């Protein structure tokens, strides 16, 4: 994985007080820039990370979006449907558990 992706994920993990959305079911045709553009309608996007699989070269279909405020995150969560490239993506608030050391298996792979 690129060093910038590891650095971005590490920054998201260390910012426990920040409002972060976990996004899954991202279509393979979408890039981080499209994710950032979509979520900018809800507020200022501080960081957007979509990790890539180094073997396939494709992203893993999930990512994280960090907003400037909790209110902006709530605005995004209140939207009933999020569509990128014609595909409905799933958005939820990042669980504190994943940010405080108990890593998911995907996070463990990204941080190696």
Swiss-Prot record:
It is found in: Mitochondrion; Nucleus. GO terms for biological process: flagellated sperm motility; mitochondrion organization; negative regulation of mitochondrial RNA catabolic process; single fertilization; spermatid development. It holds the Pfam family RRM_1. Keywords: Mitochondrion, Nucleus, Phosphoprotein, Repressor, RNA-binding, Transcription, Transcription regulation, Transit peptide. Gene3D superfamilies: 3.30.70.330. The keyword Repeat does not apply. Residues 19-98 form the RRM domain. The modification Phosphothreonine is found at residue 104. Its main location: mitochondrion. GO terms for cellular component: acrosomal vesicle; cytoplasm; mitochondrial matrix; mitochondrion; nucleus; perinuclear region of cytoplasm; ribonucleoprotein complex; sperm flagellum. GO terms for molecular function: RNA binding. The modification Phosphoserine is found at residues 15, 105. RNA-binding protein that acts as a nuclear receptor corepressor. Probably acts by binding the SRA RNA, and repressing the SRA-mediated nuclear receptor coactivation. Binds the STR7 loop of SRA RNA. Also able to repress glucocorticoid (GR), androgen (AR), thyroid (TR) and VDR-mediated transactivation. This is SRA stem-loop-interacting RNA-binding protein, mitochondrial. It comes from Mus musculus (Mouse). The lineage of its organism: Eukaryota, Metazoa, Chordata, Craniata, Vertebrata. The gene is Slirp.
